[in-house]
Amino acid sequence: MIASIRGILIAVAADHVVVETGGIGWMIYAPRPVIAALGDIGATVRLFTYLLVREDSLTLYGFETVEQRQLFETLLSVTGVGPQAALNLLSSGTTDELRLAIATGDVTRLARTPRIGKKLAERLVLELKGKINVKGLPTGAAVTPAVAAANAELSEALISLGFTDAEAAAAIAALPSDAPPDLEERVRLALRYFSAS
């Protein structure tokens, strides 16, 4: 597998770039924000790549970070999600926003992405529930020390009830911003999140 490519940017299109290294120009498909961030033609660039091998083609996909590439691979594991749909999802916002939308079951946000309808958005949430790493994801609002302490307490309570770290983090991310600091009420809200998903 070709893990990354570093070279001179020699061409830019809407959905791909060409990077020359060692006298070879590599056509690399990438999310739109990645293409926009590469800079001008002639710049030295580095992309973390994923090589998709099919019976009739070898296609390279490029990403800004290893985490973004891993998320692309995770998206491809979902039935019905091909490389173009995965690129569209990665182009629809930041990697953290996409991970949070999947972890919190935000089907409406996912379905707004081109080539992703409501059914495929629901399948994404269903098949990736618990597989998306939600540690360190923003929860929307700035977290005060009191809220952070309440979230840590809630996480411990949910884990003691048998939920995984990822499930606990997803439930915490889904809490409303005006959730009371009381542990009992926060557990009740988190359990409502699990029963709704």
From Swiss-Prot:
Annotated region (Domain I), positions in chain: 1-64
SMART domains documented for this protein: HhH1
UniProt-annotated location(s): Cytoplasm
Keywords, in A-Z order: Cytoplasm, DNA damage, DNA recombination, DNA repair, DNA-binding
Region (Domain III): 148-197
GO terms under biological process: DNA recombination; DNA repair
GO (cellular component) term, any one: cytoplasm
Location (main, coarse): cytoplasm
Residue numbers spanned by region Domain II: 65-145
Domain of life of the source: Bacteria
GO molecular function: ATP binding; four-way junction DNA binding; four-way junction helicase activity
Region called Flexible linker, residue ranges: 146-148
InterPro entries: DNA_helicase_Holl-junc_RuvA_I (IPR013849), Hlx-hairpin-Hlx_DNA-bd_motif (IPR003583), NA-bd_OB-fold (IPR012340), RuvA (IPR000085), RuvA_2-like (IPR010994), RuvA_C (IPR011114), RuvA_C_sf (IPR036267)
A family per Pfam: RuvA_N
Family statement: Belongs to the RuvA family.
Its biological purpose: The RuvA-RuvB-RuvC complex processes Holliday junction (HJ) DNA during genetic recombination and DNA repair, while the RuvA-RuvB complex plays an important role in the rescue of blocked DNA replication forks via replication fork reversal (RFR). RuvA specifically binds to HJ cruciform DNA, conferring on it an open structure. The RuvB hexamer acts as an ATP-dependent pump, pulling dsDNA into and through the RuvAB complex. HJ branch migration allows RuvC to scan DNA until it finds its consensus sequence, where it cleaves and resolves the cruciform DNA.
Domain description: Has three domains with a flexible linker between the domains II and III and assumes an 'L' shape. Domain III is highly mobile and contacts RuvB.
Subunit structure as annotated in this protein's UniProt entry: Homotetramer. Forms an RuvA(8)-RuvB(12)-Holliday junction (HJ) complex. HJ DNA is sandwiched between 2 RuvA tetramers; dsDNA enters through RuvA and exits via RuvB. An RuvB hexamer assembles on each DNA strand where it exits the tetramer. Each RuvB hexamer is contacted by two RuvA subunits (via domain III) on 2 adjacent RuvB subunits; this complex drives branch migration. In the full resolvosome a probable DNA-RuvA(4)-RuvB(12)-RuvC(2) complex forms which resolves the HJ.
Name of this chain's protein: Holliday junction branch migration complex subunit RuvA
Native source species: Roseiflexus sp. (strain RS-1)
Upper lineage: Bacteria, Bacillati, Chloroflexota, Chloroflexia, Chloroflexales
Gene field: ruvA
